[in-house]
Amino acid sequence: MAYVLTETSAGYALLKASDKKIYKSSSLIQDLDSSDKVLKEFKIAAFSKFNSAANALEEANSIIEGKVSSQLEKLLEEIKKDKKSTLIVSETKLANAINKLGLNFNVVSDAVTLDIYRAIKEYLPELLPGMSDNDLSKMSLGLAHSIGRHKLKFSADKVDVMIIQAIALLDDLDKELNTYAMRCKEWYGWHFPELAKIVTDSVAYARIILTMGIRSKASETDLSEILPEEIEERVKTAAEVSMGTEITQTDLDNINALAEQIVEFAAYREQLSNYLSARMKAIAPNLTQLVGELVGARLIAHSGSLISLAKSPASTIQILGAEKALFRALKTKHDTPKYGLLYHASLVGQATGKNKGKIARVLAAKAAVSLRYDALAEDRDDSGDIGLESRAKVENRLSQLEGRDLRTTPKVVREAKKVEMTEARAYNADADTAKAASDSESDSDDEEEEKKEKKEKKEKKRKRDDDEDSKDSKKAKKEKKDKKEKKEKKEKKEKKEKKEKKSKKEKKEKK
């Protein structure tokens, strides 16, 4: 017998086909082109109803993942009695999972079976007694919404999409602000060129334009809210002796409009930066404590989500953002990059050139731990203690490599464990002699280490001298070889010239 397993929003339906070899039919589409033919071909053999919406969601997820649930297994055992029967299923993964159960029937899932399912889905309400088309549609819609919610796992505090969009917008704002500020300085620079050299901050420059207007009003304009007293005096002095040209009121209006845009963009950028910082502390507090808000947000945006970044190994996190350099290095067989986006982290920035790669590797390892705690820990809090501890360890490692104290992060004070009081021990006089012996042993160990270091230095020096000698000997051999080749060339040339002279002489004598 041939059975067709149909998954509906109401439950599992097991349909019995009248034709044993229906899945081998060449004219299947013509055989199942009407409801009468479908009803004639298939009869319902068993139906396992879902008890609730939660049960329906659980079963649907099992089918999507290619797993056989206990409810489905119970239904399949009903056709176990029919020997040499065939079960037609829609998914290949599900077919493989059913085969592993060891039931006594053949499981089929191929391109031909899709036509069977297409016909069954079209006339499904007629095949299931007591089920109307409207009821099935409502159930399907409810189940679709449940699956969607399950996949999204929506939580207002866990939406990393907000971080991805915020960091992308922040980068765009920075580019726009730089472009607008440059254009504003070039435009207003025709009227007051000295101002750009005195005031380097773009926002302060735009605010001065809005407050002062034309440079002739500088002396009577109060700029104390924008600039310090010394710089304000310099601006006013420069305005009196400026080399700039005069501009019309129309020009100034357009410059003011651009300056207003710069001030508004800067205010919105600051607001967006604060929003991003708050989001990062809510979603990835440990990563934020370790690498900072901006670097952490860029890592999440580059990988697509917090979960996918947490699944990445430390080696991937280390070079994330340097993919082009990595593939170019692999193609040309050169050294691979040591860091990507992590280069902009403050801890990597504190290291000198030779230690940047080592610190990037340590930082990537600690970032991987922090990310997994942020993304996957069930009982995590938003204090970021793991990130602070990891940062302290990276700073200690950096201090060891640099040979100077660079530690800035305070130690995380955790709640002390309860200590049980025991009876105090009496003074042991023998311990003094043991201590003295251990001190003498440590002194002897130090002497042995010093001897080893001296020996290693001597060996390194000898190797260096040997290398230099070998280089000199190679150079001498090369020079000797070159001289020999030159000599041989010269001899050949002389022989050739003699031969030519001789032949010329013989020709003359013949004449």
UniProtKB/Swiss-Prot annotation:
It comes from the Eukaryota. Pfam families: Nop, NOP5NT. Residues 283-403 form the Nop domain. Residues 440-450 have a biased composition (Acidic residues). Keywords: Coiled coil, Isopeptide bond, Nucleus, Ribonucleoprotein, Ribosome biogenesis, rRNA processing, Ubl conjugation. The keyword Nucleus applies. GO terms for cellular component: box C/D methylation guide snoRNP complex; nucleolus; small-subunit processome. The keyword Cell membrane does not apply. GO terms for molecular function: snoRNA binding. Transmembrane segments: none annotated. GO terms for biological process: rRNA processing. Residues 435-511 form a coiled coil. Residues 454-463, 474-511 have a biased composition (Basic residues). Gene3D superfamilies: 1.10.287.4070, Nop domain. PROSITE patterns: NOP. It is found in: Nucleus, Nucleolus. Residues 423-511 are annotated as: Disordered. Its main location: nucleus. There is a cross-link at residue 281 (Glycyl lysine isopeptide (Lys-Gly) (interchain with G-Cter in ubiquitin)). Interacts with SIK1/NOP56 and NOP1. Interacts with the trimethylguanosine synthase TGS1. Component of the ribosomal small subunit (SSU) processome composed of at least 40 protein subunits and snoRNA U3. Required for pre-18S rRNA processing. May bind microtubules. Belongs to the NOP5/NOP56 family. This is Nucleolar protein 58. The lineage of its organism: Eukaryota, Fungi, Dikarya, Ascomycota, Saccharomycotina. The gene is NOP58.
